[in-house]
């Protein structure tokens, strides 16, 4: 009994201090509805994985949005307590609060694979490098130059992998194409042996973004780490040779990111950290080649399933071809005329955006829609929350490129295939450019049909055609 009263007083004191000093703005805010604890978190994870394999993540989101009748919910995803935002307003809120309430977040696998290059250079050098990358892929004058180079690469690719073939599997050769384009513009890599050495290693890197970070022989993560190191070594060698070519042999060409960065830094008297630059180039390459190749697969699938839409695309491209002499490269003004082809691209991105979305981390406790999002929790915006939601897109499961040429207004932030805010995809215009050029050349030469009529797109976890999309080709020049 002697200890009872002091114990009660101690407990009361602790509770008083807790409620007295608890942050006022969130003290009454509940967590979003959902499940993050055992054993229900296991069911959440497996349900997400199952729906991803059938390319129906939108159903995972819709079921919880409807169940809780909210614009957000909490769940356990990739080992994290995570809040899913389910509305255009949520997308806008998140994009507008980068570096204020949230910051970009990536799974630990991603960071370990790339061995963060930013740790080796100053913040000023990080900002400078990003500006150099962005200007090369975003400025109109630079993009106009890329059209002719990309056109050359696409024509060579079609001649090598498509001409004379009765059947092709689209995914692997589309990857070869977008990889060749990316390597050409990033570092002027044209040697097919180097491309053939880099591509499998980069494929291992991309395949492991969401793998378990277990570095044992034979695991995805182990292959990704080895692949990343191999690519960095190749790029360091390329950087060293390029410096010799530019500053000792007087090379004049500078139509790639690497040469422009080296020349600009040399002009300003800045010594380049070769390892850090190689890491940045590998990271940029991983983002540049995979998603456009998946979108090419999606477009090929959608055109095979919709012959009347294919006919409109071909008619548009043949009309554009009439304005060019045989063998003459396309120019930016030609791409601006590809209005219906652009609608096909946009609709393919709506239905099957290669990236499901990205992640943010809460910098501090904050509230949204009356719910508390605690510091350190992860927040996920997803294309699946709005792209296939009938509230924002009529007949959302229907492939209907005409929806982008009608006067029906698209709700702001409901169509977000490239994200938004400070972290919007920096290469979005370049990605569209290379896909449109590919469409131009392939529809001029071929019609095609799916070898497996029921083949669909799946996510494991990256988007891909279930069997790589083999197609039978019907060339027009036979």
UniProtKB/Swiss-Prot annotation:
Keywords in alphabetical order:
Iron, Membrane, Metal-binding, Oxidoreductase, Transmembrane, Transmembrane helix
Q: For this UniProt entry, which residues form the secretion signal?
A: none
Q: In which tissues is it expressed?
A: Mainly expressed in petioles and, to a lower extent, in roots.
Named cofactor requirement(s): heme
Q: Which GO terms describe its molecular function?
A: heme binding; iron ion binding; monooxygenase activity; oxidoreductase activity, acting on paired donors, with incorporation or reduction of molecular oxygen
Question: Is tRNA processing one of the keywords UniProt gives this record?
Answer: no
For this UniProt entry, what's an example GO CC term?
Answer: membrane
Membrane topology per the record? Single-pass membrane protein
Subcellular location, principal: membrane
Q: Where are the transmembrane segments?
A: 1-21
Q: InterPro entries given for it?
A: Cyt_P450, Cyt_P450_CS, Cyt_P450_E_grp-I, Cyt_P450_sf
Q: What does this protein do?
A: Monooxygenase involved in the biosynthesis of limonoids triterpene natural products such as azadirachtin, an antifeedant widely used as bioinsecticide, and possessing many medicinal applications including anti-tumoral, anti-malarial, anti-rheumatic, antibacterial, anti-inflammatory, anti-pyretic and diuretic effects. Catalyzes the formation of (1S,3bR,4R,5aR,9aR,9bR,11aS)-1-(1-hydroxy-4-oxobutan-2-yl)-3b,6,6,9a,11a-pentamethyl-7-oxo-1H,2H,3bH,4H,5H,5aH,6H,7H,9aH,9bH,10H,11H,11aH-cyclopenta[a]phenanthren-4-yl acetate.
Q: Which family does it belong to?
A: Belongs to the cytochrome P450 family.
Q: What class of enzyme is it?
A: oxidoreductase
Compartments where found: Membrane
Biological process annotations from GO: sterol metabolic process
Quick one: which residues bind heme?
425
Q: Which domain of life is it from?
A: Eukaryota
Q: Which reactions is this enzyme annotated as catalysing? A: (1S,3bR,4R,5aR,9aR,9bR,11aS)-1-[(4R)-5-[(2S)-3,3-dimethyloxiran-2-yl]-1,4-dihydroxybutan-2-yl]-3b,6,6,9a,11a-pentamethyl-7-oxo-1H,2H,3bH,4H,5H,5aH,6H,7H,9aH,9bH,10H,11H,11aH-cyclopenta[a]phenanthren-4-yl acetate + reduced [NADPH--hemoprotein reductase] + O2 = (1S,3bR,4R,5aR,9aR,9bR,11aS)-1-(1-hydroxy-4-oxobutan-2-yl)-3b,6,6,9a,11a-pentamethyl-7-oxo-1H,2H,3bH,4H,5H,5aH,6H,7H,9aH,9bH,10H,11H,11aH-cyclopenta[a]phenanthren-4-yl acetate + 2-methylpropanoate + oxidized [NADPH--hemoprotein reductase] + H2O + 2 H(+)
Q: What is this protein called?
A: Cytochrome P450 family 716 subfamily AD polypeptide 4
EC numbers listed for it are 1.14.14.-
- Entries under PANTHER family matching the protein: BETA-AMYRIN 28-OXIDASE, CYTOCHROME P450 26
């Amino acid at each position: 009994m002697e200890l009872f009263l002091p114990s009660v007083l101690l407990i009361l004191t602790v509770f008083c201090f807790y409620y007295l000093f608890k942050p006022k703005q969130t003290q009454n805010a509940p967590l979003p509805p959902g499940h993050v604890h055992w054993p229900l978190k296991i069911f959440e994870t497996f349900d997400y994985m199952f729906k991803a394999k059938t390319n129906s993540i939108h159903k995972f989101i819709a079921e919880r949005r409807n169940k809780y009748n909210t614009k957000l919910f909490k769940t356990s995803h990739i080992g994290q307590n995570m809040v899913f935002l389910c509305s255009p307003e949520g997308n806008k809120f998140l994009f507008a609060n980068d570096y204020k309430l949230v910051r970009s977040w990536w799974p630990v696998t991603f960071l370990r694979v790339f061995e963060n290059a930013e740790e080796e250079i100053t913040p000023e050098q990080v900002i400078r490098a990003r500006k150099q990358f962005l200007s090369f892929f975003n400025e109109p004058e630079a993009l106009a130059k890329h059209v002719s180079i990309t056109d050359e690469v696409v024509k060579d690719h079609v001649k090598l992998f498509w001409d004379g073939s009765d059947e092709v599997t689209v995914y692997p050769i589309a990857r070869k194409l977008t990889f060749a384009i990316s390597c050409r513009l990033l570092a002027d890599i044209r040697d097919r042996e180097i491309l053939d050495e880099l591509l499998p290693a980069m494929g291992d890197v991309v395949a492991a973004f969401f793998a378990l970070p277990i570095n044992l022989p034979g695991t995805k993560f182990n292959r990704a780490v080895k692949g990343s190191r191999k690519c960095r070594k190749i790029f360091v060698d390329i950087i060293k040779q390029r410096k010799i070519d530019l500053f000792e042999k007087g090379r004049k060409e500078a139509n790639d990111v690497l040469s422009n960065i080296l020349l600009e830094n040399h002009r300003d008297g800045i010594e380049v950290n070769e390892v850090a630059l190689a890491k940045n180039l590998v990271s940029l390459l991983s983002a540049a080649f995979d998603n456009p190749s998946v979108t090419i697969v999606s477009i090929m699938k959608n055109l095979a399933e919709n012959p009347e839409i294919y006919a409109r695309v071909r008619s548009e491209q043949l009309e554009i071809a009439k304005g060019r002499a045989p063998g003459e490269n396309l120019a930016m003004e030609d791409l601006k005329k590809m209005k219906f082809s652009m609608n096909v691209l946009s609709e393919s991105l709506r239905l099957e955006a290669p990236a499901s979305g990205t992640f943010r981390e809460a910098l501090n406790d904050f509230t949204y829609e009356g719910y508390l999002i605690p510091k350190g929790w992860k927040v996920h915006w997803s294309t699946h929350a709005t792209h296939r939601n009938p509230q924002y897109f009529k007949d959302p499961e229907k492939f209907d490129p005409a929806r982008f040429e009608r006067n029906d207004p698209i709700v702001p932030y409901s169509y977000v295939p490239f994200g938004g805010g400070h972290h919007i995809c920096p290469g979005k215009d370049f990605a569209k450019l290379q896909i449109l050029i590919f469409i131009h050349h392939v529809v001029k030469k071929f019609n095609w049909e799916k070898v497996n009529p029921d083949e669909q797109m799946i996510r494991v976890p990256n988007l891909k055609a279930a069997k790589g999309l083999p197609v039978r080709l019907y060339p027009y020049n036979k």
